[in-house]
Regions:
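Beta-strand-rich modules
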Residues: 78-98
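Secondary-structure capping and domain/repeat boundary segments
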Residues: 263, 357, 446-448, 665, ...
């Protein structure tokens, strides 16, 4: 019996032990989350698991058994893996008696490429890769078309900078951009290709690739060859330019010593300083047909070049442009030249040729004399231009007589000469800056020539006298100006005898050219005066009023710049042009009428006028600024911040109203309103744009009181931020002529309740962002693109039609439009629309037909009425001038069968029509 009891007890104990063993109450750990691979460092990372002691990593290479590794941290380096495809997972290890191991995490896939020495970084919203070097790149570099399923589109700044062990580079077909210094100082690269899709080459991208030989082909998408792009590529033998290159910048091909021939594209307009300097084997140079400017030393030291044809398009040949082209003796000069700068052809065969003539010419331009001390000058009768510094410092001539054929006198052409008499001829139209500067003995100046009997003067057709043109001609006390003259430059007659008897104002014949110390506060310009020179009253802080007679036709650039006390100006009715900066920062200037014959208002012409404590509020009966009907151009910053007071104590409602302008009426001829032209007119309430065609960026920026704008019938383009934060603007009715609405054009115009887009084809990014009062909007069939966040936070907008013409809808276009239903003509969003075009998940009704009168036709099919947010309700469509009644089953229905609320109940395949009633 005792044995039986003992056996039962032992059996019970064993059973309990088994029971306890089978009832392990330790907790299983959670599986690791957020298992990811950091590509830049090839590190496996995951989120820490509470209670984990260690982590086990399972690494399985395709075709091989998995192996396991242990990690005590929440990361593990994968750099030791060989090339191949891997499946990787992680689990958390529990503590004995406390917790159990977790299940495996979700697997991640990993491709270990062959080591290339390159790093790939995601760009452009993680849709593309940019490549750079990790520091070990060497040998033959191959930049792939694709990486991890995405295109490689960019080579980063200094990506392979100074990699002397790189010998060749093959660039993938998808690369569009090569960054600054990307391959600079890769001195052993022997070859490189530029893919056809390339559009951008960075500064110094290939500079000092000294062994890069053969031919470089510039792709068609490239428009600019930037500074130093191929400088010091001493082995480069040929360059083939794409037809769309328009600019070659400074030193782009400097010291490409093996280039033998160049053919530049016809679209090329600009050649920068030193662009092809010291290309010492260049024997053939074709400049194309479009170049306008050859800058300083652009082709200097081309010691093998013998001839060149300058095309008719070239207007300026810069200083030293062909300096030290020792064999250059044959130059054909086009007929468009307006300036040949100092030493443009110095030390060429042209200059050093052994001829009997002392005068040196290129084409019909006089360059200078071999001997600058000769007392005789024999200019050819067909001479049309005098190059800059042509006779500068000549000590032999006492009388200078130019033939009537001469049209242009260059910069400092006759500076510091000992001439006493100068007769410039009747053909001259332009005298360059400092042309006769410091000719201290010059006493007689004839701006024309004598007739055959030497009795009467034939005045020249002179239009421009340049800055400082006669400065320092100490004994010159008289000059007769021709009636053709339009511009007299800054201080053109400063330090001449003309100043000796001047009181207050300095006159050169019938032009005001300067003022003298001691000028009075009130000045009346004498009758018969025809022009005011550039900078004539610059910084004349004592001047408070000036009266200009009706004979004045020209007021020069910056004529009254910084006349801070000037408050009263009477402009003549005959004035046609107000030049750039004319009344710049005349802080005390009060409102006045613009002359009726005005055609041009220059850049910053009235910049910050009327901003000082001395300015007075304009007459309330004269609160309209009329832009005369003949004005075609209003320059950038023309009226910028006029009336923005600096007085901290002024009442808030007057703070921006020193000019007293409530309205602007623009005449019918204006073609262009410049950027920031009326920026800061915060008291402005209404604008009539008349015949304006183009409104540039920020033209009416932050005109916070602007309530009404008549956009006219001619407007074609509205620039970026043109009406930015015009918070009082009520509606935007654009004409059919309009095509472009710039980014931020009507940003945060919070009072705009109605918008008609006219003939717009593109709606820029952020164009109507934050228009919280906007309720209705019909997008016309002309619109093809809607920019990023174009209608973001238009919280009152209830419906919008996206027509079949719209090819592109950018990211977050309708973000924050909390009341919006979107009607779309397609059966789904096209692939050309951004992935997050409807990032607010507003309800979308697909398969809508849109008629020309903005009626709706819906195809109700299964799945086409999409409530992407369960809290959203379908809003009624909106049509200007009508009230929506409901949805009918035929185009003639007058009684609705459905409302927007129960539209989803319509049977599949039914076609419904919007029913409208006139308001």
């Amino acid at each position: 019996m005792k044995k039986l009891r003992l056996l039962l007890l032992i059996s019970l104990i064993i059973s309990c032990l088994f029971a306890f063993a089978s009832c392990d109450d330790t907790e299983e750990l959670s599986a690791p989350q957020n298992v990811e691979i950091e590509q830049a460092t090839l590190t496996l990372n995951w989120k820490a698991v509470a209670g984990a002691r260690l982590y086990t990593i399972s690494i399985a290479k395709d075709g091989e058994e998995p192996r396991e590794a242990i990690a005590s941290k929440t990361y593990y380096s994968l750099t030791g893996l060989s090339e191949g495809h891997y499946t990787i997972k992680v689990k958390a290890n529990g503590k004995e008696g406390v917790s159990r191991d977790s299940k495996w995490s979700q697997t991640v896939l990993f491709d270990r490429e062959k080591e290339t020495g390159m790093t790939f970084t995601l760009i452009n919203g993680n849709t593309e890769y940019e490549v750079s070097s990790k520091g070990v790149a060497s040998g033959d570099i191959v930049i792939p078309d694709m990486y991890r399923g995405l295109p490689v589109t960019s080579i980063g700044k200094k990506a392979f900078f100074n990699k002397s062990d790189v010998t060749s580079v093959t660039i993938g077909a998808n690369v569009k951009s090569i960054g600054d210094y990307a391959f600079a100082n890769c001195s052993y690269i022997t070859s490189i290709n530029l893919p056809k899709g390339l559009t951008t080459i960075g500064e110094s991208a290939f500079a000092s690739c000294r062994l890069m030989a053969g031919e470089i082909v510039i792709p068609e998408g490239v428009t600019t060859i930037p500074k130093n792009a191929f400088a010091y590529c001493g082995s480069l033998e040929a360059v083939v330019f794409g037809s769309n290159v328009t600019r070659i910048e400074t030193s782009a091909f400097t010291d490409c010593a093996k280039l033998t021939a160049l053919t530049l594209p016809d679209k090329l307009e600009y050649i920068g300083n030193l662009a092809f300097a010291r290309c010492k084997k260049l024997t053939s140079l074709d400049l194309g047909t479009g170049v306008k400017e050859i800058n300083d030393y652009a082709f200097s030291e081309l010691v093998a070049l013998e001839s060149v044809a300058i095309p008719n398009s070239v207007e300026r040949i810069g200083e030293g442009a062909f300096y030290l082209c020792e064999l250059l003796g044959n130059v054909t000069l086009g007929n468009g030249i307006k300036e040949i700068a100092n030493g443009a052809f110095y030390d060429t065969k042209l200059w050093n040729a052994n001829t009997s003539s002392n005068e040196i010419y290129v084409g019909k331009w006089f360059l200078g004399c071999k001997d600058n001390t000769q007392p005789v000058l024999n200019l050819r009768e067909d001479t049309i231009g005098i190059a800059s510094y042509a006779l500068y410092g000549n000590t032999g001539l006492s009388t200078l007589i130019l033939p009537d054929s001469v049209q242009i006198i260059g910069e400092a052409a006759f500076g510091k000469m000992s001439i006493i008499v100068a007769i410039i001829g009747s053909g001259v139209t332009e005298i360059g800056s400092e042309a006769f500067g410091s000719c201290k003995q010059l006493s007689t100046l004839i701006l024309g020539s004598f007739d055959d009997k030497n009795e009467n003067i034939k005045y020249s057709s002179l239009k421009t006298i340049g800055d400082y043109a006669f400065r320092g001609c100490e004994v010159l006390d008289k000059v007769e100006m021709p009636s053709s003259l339009k511009v007299v430059g800054t201080y053109a007659f400063r330090d001449t005898g003309i100043y000796k008897n001047s009181e207050n104002v300095v006159y050169a014949d019938n032009w005001v050219v300067d003022y003298v110390e001691g000028i009075g506060a009130n000045v009346a310009i004498k009758e018969g005066t025809v022009g005011i020179a550039n900078y004539a009253f610059y910084n004349c802080t004592v001047l408070s009023s000036i009266t200009l007679p009706n004979s004045v036709k020209t007021v020069g650039r910056a004529a009254f710049y910084d006349c801070s006390s000037l408050s009263q100006v009477e402009l003549p009715a005959t004035l046609e042009v107000i030049e750039d900066y004319t009344f710049y920062r005349c802080k005390s200037l009060n409102l006045f009428s613009l002359p009726p014959m005005l055609t041009y208002i220059g850049r910053s012409a009235f910049y910050k006028c009327g901003t000082s404590a001395n300015a007075t509020v304009g007459d309330t009966d004269n609160d309209v600024l009329f832009i005369p009907s003949d004005v075609k151009y209003i320059g950038d910053f023309a009226f910028y911040n006029c009336g923005y007071s600096e007085r901290a104590s002024i009442e808030e409602e007057q703070y921006y109203n020193i000019f007293g302008i409530d309205s602007i009426v623009i005449g019918g001829s204006v073609e262009y309103i410049g950027s920031n032209a009326f920026n800061g007119f915060i008291s402005l309430k209404s604008v009539d744009l008349g015949g304006t065609q183009y409104i540039a960026e920020k033209a009416f920026y932050k005109c916070e009181s602007l309530a009404t704008v008549d956009f006219g019938t001619s407007l074609k383009s509205i620039g970026e931020k043109a009406f930015y934060k015009c918070e009082s603007l009520k509606e935007v009715i654009l004409p059919e002529t309009l095509t472009d609405i710039g980014s931020y054009a009507f940003y945060k115009c919070e009072s705009v309740a109605n918008v008609e887009l006219g003939g717009a084809t593109a709606i820029g990014s952020f164009a109507f962002y934050g228009n919280t009062s906007l309720k209705m909007l019909d997008i016309p069939m002309s619109v093809t693109s809607i920019g990023k966040q174009a209608f973001r936070n238009c919280k009152s907008l209830t419906s919008i039609i996206v027509s079949p013409a719209i090819e592109v809808v950018e990211q977050h276009a309708f973000y924050g439009c909390s009341s919006l239903t979107i009607y779309v003509a397609y059966d789904k969003a096209p692939d050309t629309w951004h992935k997050y075009w409807n990032s607010s998940y507003r309800p979308v009704v697909y398969n809508c037909e849109l008629s020309e009168d903005f009626s709706y036709v819906l195809y109700v099919e299964k799945g086409t009425i999409s409530h992407l947010n369960s809290n959203s309700s379908l809003s009624d469509p909106v049509r200007a001038g009508y009230v929506f009644i409901g949805w009918g089953t035929s185009s003639t229905a007058s009684v609705p069968a459905f409302t927007s609320a129960n539209l989803s109940e319509a049977e599949s395949g039914r076609k419904l029509y919007a029913i409208w009633a006139e308001e």
